[in-house]
Every structure is written in C-alpha cells, then in structure tokens.
C-alpha cells in the first residue's frame, strides 16, 4: 500500500496533478503594478514601510521641539518604553556641549559603482535635484530638520565639508548626524556654526564620493533604525531617536519629573526626612506631593 501511494505521489508531481497547491501559493501575493509617471522621483522618496506608518505619525511643532530642548536625555529615555534601544553612542560633536534636537531628514549612501552612478544621475535629472544628497538637503531641508545620514559607520565615507554644512544650516536645519565621516573639522568647529552641531564618527580630508540611494526612507545609524520624521535628541555622548507620536507623552512625563524632583530637593534642603524616604519618595511623601499638585 505504501509503495502504491509513493508511486502515485511521484506520478502526480510529474503530471501536475498537484497544480492546486501551486495556485494556492500564487494567491498569497498581490499583483505587481507599473509605477505611475513621476513615481520614482517623488520628492519624499517613496518607502512602502513609511506608507504604512505615516498616517499615524503626527506633525511636530516648533514649540514642541523647543520644549524638548530642556528635557534631559535620561528623562526621555525613561518615558519611551520599548524605544529605549534606539540610542546610538560613539559620536563626536563639532560643537561640544551643544544639544541637538529636531526631526530626522534621513538619507542613505552606498559606495560608488558605474551602474549605480548612472541610475542616480537619471533620478536626479528627472526629479530636478542634486544627486549629492547633502546638496539636496541644502535646497530642501526645513527649519527644525536634522539631517541623518547612513554612511558606513567608522569604516565608511564622508558626507560633506563646511560648505555643504553651511548650505544645510542656512535652510534652518538644527544640525546633522553622520554615521560616517566629514571633512573640514576646523571649519565646522568655528563660531559661525554655533547652534549647529554635527555628530559624526570621524573626520578626514577625503571628498565625498559615495552615492545617495535613499532619501526620506528608513536608515541604520549605528545599531539602531531611524525613520524619517523621528525625533532626534543628541549630545556629546550619543544620539537618541524615537517616533513623533511619543513626543507629547515625553513632554508630559518630563513635567511630572520636574515637579517631583523640585519637591525632593526641597525636602532635602529642609533636612526633616531621611534620604531613603525622599529618593525614591516614600508613600506618605508621594501623597503629599499629590496634594500639592
């Protein structure tokens, strides 16, 4: 009996008697479609992932970003739950001590090759943008944007020098994060770049040669994923990214922490309670804080 079933299975495979299985498999996939005119040169560089996410991502206001500048990174870290892993360390800051806060304008670069270069030229011509994506940002960045560039990390390549940075700065961008390098370090440390920090992995005199292949699409910075429109908070230690839908939660949490810590400092100055009862607050002191609010 087993031999007969085995022979039938072989016969079915040879004759296509199991065609229904192939039909079922094919039905899993949606039919592909031709891209409409202008699709490849959409100004926001179409990303299927972002097409799913964007409807739920709120607009971020300049006032919210201004509020966020005063929130310590540790407080943000405590408020974002599962997004705590989105911190990338190991960056140098061209403006030591200056904080970087804004919305991510992402771009991804790859080492050059002739066919990739031809494709980049075609898209740049059709879309009427500069194929050098840092130059494109110098024409398209909006106030409050942070250019976030994936450029191969410590083994990668340079994004720009002081002229490219000046163009981006003049658009009102808040700064730049480069998972890679830059040139003109001395120039970028000049006073004219006060308020425009560039977080980077290294600097050397090479000019830019890598090709921009993604603009306003998901990128990898260090070991974390960054999406266009993410909130960027950077300092001398590193840079943190989180989705804009969490921004209001972060600001509300920060206000709560500020009130609690002011209360704790007052208790410490009064010297009426033990430190262990103040930090963290004992239940009775938590109730007192609640009554004061």
Name each region found by the language model:
Residues 201-279:
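Acidic, glycine-rich flexible loop/linker segments
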Residues 167-206:
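Ligand/cofactor pocket segment of small-molecule handling proteins
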Residues 19-23:
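Boundary at the C-terminal end of the N-terminal hydrophobic targeting segment
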Residues 89-91, 148-150, 176-180, 198-200, ...:
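General beta-strand structural signal in soluble alpha/beta enzymes
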Residues 2-10:
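Sec-dependent signal peptide recognition
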Residues 135-180:
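Extracellular/luminal Protease-associated
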Residues 52-127:
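N-terminal low-complexity or amphipathic/hydrophobic leaders
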